[in-house]
A protein has these predicted regions:
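C-terminal interaction modules of eukaryotic adaptor/scaffold proteins
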Residues: 517-523, 527-536, 542
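Alpha-solenoid helical repeat scaffolds
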Residues: 14, 19-513, 534-550, 562-568
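Bacterial N-terminal signal peptides that target proteins for export
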Residues: 1-10
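Flexible, disordered linker segments and immediate boundary regions flanking tandem C2H2 zinc-finger modules
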Residues: 551-556
Length: 568
């Protein structure tokens, strides 16, 4: 009798222990979903200590590390799971997720194929029978993972949810994952995704996940009012779900409802004030263009946990992208980012990290360092040839005009049909600085053909031809400067420097042509525009000492015009 009571007591204790463990694993996943990452991490550490051979623990802990942007830590956990329990399909899904997160699709696909084979081996086999709920769990994680790839396999992900529906048609997760796959496959047509999300909501009306996803769908489509409406429905369903408040705040920021956004974010932080939450708030502020507040929140996140390396990146960007850039502070934070990243290996360095620091270096007139960073960016991502313009500009500032011209031309040659007036203007200016006036004029001609009402293109055609035709054999220079003059005279203050150059040339031109009234008119225009300009010292002498000009009556400048430049 005593033995029977003792056995019953042990079994009862075991059942309670197993139930507590199951709830704890569920709790850890709930913390993860609720973006309470520090709490989740604490629970996962306890789980690993309690059941160090349970592969699921390693999978979900590794997944948390990916969400926290610690891929190296995630890989260690996923690999440990495989080493400890190689027949647990989820551990292989974890490795697949890591590989696809780090752009290694082939290895990811191998792990997914192996995970599927494990499910098929265990499903329906005597002694190995895998429950339908377990098959669904694994297939849904595979489906989600397949949408992470560089070349996502959306169709297989959707097909897997169909398999899952046959196994368990009442599981709302099936329809959430299907909705995610549909939306990622076709972000323009959100109807299939919304249909799936609504099915999930019907199956689990106490969950806010479906309406949060519908809200995100509308937010991605820039329909913020509808997005906020669905976030409100989600919050009404579960007011403790922190991400709904964060997403609502982000949507409110994007439509400049700043007071409402701050209230939403305050609730988000009240529900979840761990360092990652502060990081998420910082990121939302940055995306909304609220750089000063993003810097404040970023530093608060770092005060809580200085190991969140990505925050240094965001603050560095804020300083260089603000209306009043602080290049020195931007460089400081990017330097900290690179130093921390080198130690932790996370997050992955991307081309934009070097590009943004390069822009800060250039803004701080450290263009040799800027060029080094731009070239590092190209090593990281060879497709980022859009930075050729930035490289060229730094070379131009350093007066290395040959290298500047080389990179401006590279930028143009990427797609000549899409070259902008800025491209042609910069290229022409660089050739002009090299005294290659003929090719400079060709570049400026492209400029004026594309935008004939932009005065600066005509100005630079005049400057180039001024050197090409020093003996005034052609009227081209005159025509270009006159066309510039007509366009620029409407805003004299803005164009003062260039107007003085053009009017002095035209004054000299008419003097040589012995049209003294027009010569006097242009010289007088230049002097009146800015008497203190050094170029007008000689102009004043000419007006006072040249007997022909002195004797002439200044003409109305409008009567001195020739025909417009047209197709010259």
């Amino acid at each position: 009798m005593k033995t029977q009571i003792k056995t019953t007591t042990i079994l009862f204790t075991l059942l309670i222990s197993m139930s507590a463990f199951a709830q704890t694993l569920k709790e850890a996943r709930n913390f993860t979903d609720n973006e309470q990452y520090e709490k989740a991490r604490g629970v996962f550490k306890l789980l690993l200590a309690k059941e160090p051979t349970n592969g699921d623990n390693f999978f979900y802990f590794g997944d948390l590390m990916l969400k926290m942007e610690y891929p190296d830590s995630a890989k260690i956990l996923f690999q440990k799971g495989v080493d400890i329990n190689a027949t647990n399909a989820l551990t292989h899904v974890g490795l697949a997720r890591y590989y696809m997160y780090t752009w290694n699709d082939p290895k990811g696909a191998q792990e997914i194929a192996y995970a599927k084979s494990l499910v098929q081996t265990h499903a329906g086999k005597k002694g190995l029978d895998m429950a339908a709920s377990r098959q669904v769990q694994i297939y849904l994680e595979i489906a989600e993972t397949e949408t992470w790839a560089v070349s996502p396999n959306y169709d297989d992900a959707i097909n897997l949810t169909t398999v899952c529906e046959k196994l368990d048609s009442k599981n709302p997760e099936v329809f959430l994952v299907r909705g995610d796959s549909y939306y990622r496959k076709d972000p323009v047509n959100g109807t299939p995704a919304i249909t799936s999300y609504n099915l999930a909501a019907k199956l689990d009306p106490k969950s806010c996940q479906a309406n949060v996803r519908i809200g995100k769908l509308y937010a991605n489509g820039k329909n913020m009012q509808s997005a906020i409406g669905f976030y409100n429905i989600a919050i009404k369903t579960d007011s403790t779900f922190a991400p709904a408040w964060r997403l609502k705040g982000e949507a409110q920021y994007s439509i400049m409802k700043f007071d409402s956004a701050q209230k939403s974010m305050a609730t988000y932080l009240r529900l979840n004030d761990d360092p990652t939450a502060r990081y998420n708030y910082c990121k939302a502020l940055y995306k909304g263009g609220n750089y000063s507040d993003a810097i404040v929140q970023g530093n608060l996140a770092l005060d809580k946990d200085s190991s969140i390396t990505v925050v240094y990146r965001i603050i560095g960007r804020c300083y260089i992208e603000s209306k009043t850039p602080d290049a020195v502070k931007s460089i400081e934070y990017f330097n900290k980012f690179f130093a921390k990243q080198k130690i932790s290996g996370a997050p992955v360095v991307i081309a934009d990290d070097y590009i943004d620091r390069g822009k800060a270096f250039s803004k701080n007139n450290q263009d040799s360092l800027a060029i080094l960073d731009y070239l590092k960016a190209l090593n990281v991502d060879t497709s980022r040839k859009d930075i050729y313009f930035d490289v060229a500009t730094s070379y131009y500032k350093m007066k290395k005009y040959d290298k500047a011209a080389e990179f401006y031309k590279k930028k143009i040659d990427l797609n000549p049909a899409n070259a902008t007036i800025s491209d042609w203007n910069a290229y022409g200016r660089t050739l002009f600085a090299q005294k290659d006036y003929a090719n400079a004029d060709l570049a400026f001609r492209k400029f004026t053909t594309m935008d004939p009402l932009n005065s600066i293109g005509w100005y630079w055609r005049g400057r180039a031809n001024q050197y090409l035709d020093k003996e005034l054999k052609s009227d081209s220079t005159r025509i270009f400067f006159e066309t510039f003059f007509d366009l620029a005279d409407k805003d004299r203050e803005k164009n003062k420097k260039e107007l003085i150059t053009a009017s002095i040339y035209l004054g000299g031109y008419f003097n040589v042509k012995k049209n003294f009234p027009c010569s006097k008119a242009y010289f007088q225009y230049s002097l009146d525009l800015d008497p203190a300009n050094p170029a007008n010292v000689d102009v004043k002498k000419i007006l006072e000492t040249d007997k022909d000009i002195k004797a002439a009556t200044a003409a109305d400048i409008n009567t001195c015009r020739s025909t417009a430049a047209g197709g010259k």
